[in-house]
Amino acid sequence: RAIQLARQYGNPDDLLFINDYGLEGADQRKCLGLIDYVKYVESKGVKVDGIGTQMHIAIDSNKDNIAQMFQKLGATGKLIKVSELDIKVNTSSPTTENLAQQAEMYQYVIDMYKKYIPADKQYGITIWGVSDNEKEHVNWIPNDAPNLWDANYARKHAYKGVADGLAGKDVSGDFTGDLE
């Protein structure tokens, strides 16, 4: 009913998404259930413009499940948004290897998004959180380091993983690291 009221009383140019977490789960039931729910809502005469996926995942999340989720979402013909992406390293004191795995997973998610979601249906990727500073996520994933900047606001390997994924190539030769 909420989406029906939003469509009825909202701005006619508003894009309405149905968003959920855990769509990359092992058996894909939640992803398929959400896709079926969107079809159900539309069968009642209410247009749904897109589907959002909150991706609070970890460095050891199953990559095949992530790819399958994006394949299924891409096949809907809807706009697709990754609305909350963060990648846990499962420790508050990550090693260099943990940080490299995190960067690789960030890049993998973006690569799979770009591979399976048609370009005209890619509505964007939002990174959840800024830094690993405890004050920023004391109530969300405490004792971990899920973000692109460390606790002192220095870029982590994950930042480059995102940049490489968005660029579709290794940006090391093109990127000086300067923000100006």
Language-model features: locations:
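Short, electropositive alpha-helical surface patch
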Residues: 26-41, 139-150
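Charged/polar, solvent-exposed surface patches and flexible loops
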Residues: 8, 36, 160, 164
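Short acidic, gly/pro-rich beta-turn/loop elements at beta-sheet edges
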Residues: 26-28, 61-63, 135
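Short, surface-exposed loop/turn motifs that are enriched in glycine and acidic residues
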Residues: 26-27, 55-59, 95-99
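Aromatic-rich peripheral "rim/lid" segments of glycoside hydrolase catalytic domains that contact
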Residues: 64-179
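Aromatic- and acid-rich polysaccharide-binding/catalytic face
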Residues: 9, 14-20, 34-61, 66-91
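Aromatic-lined carbohydrate-recognition surfaces of secreted/lumenal glycan-active proteins
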Residues: 1-31, 81-84, 124-130
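Well-ordered, non-membrane alpha-helical segments in soluble/globular domains
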Residues: 1, 31-37, 103-108
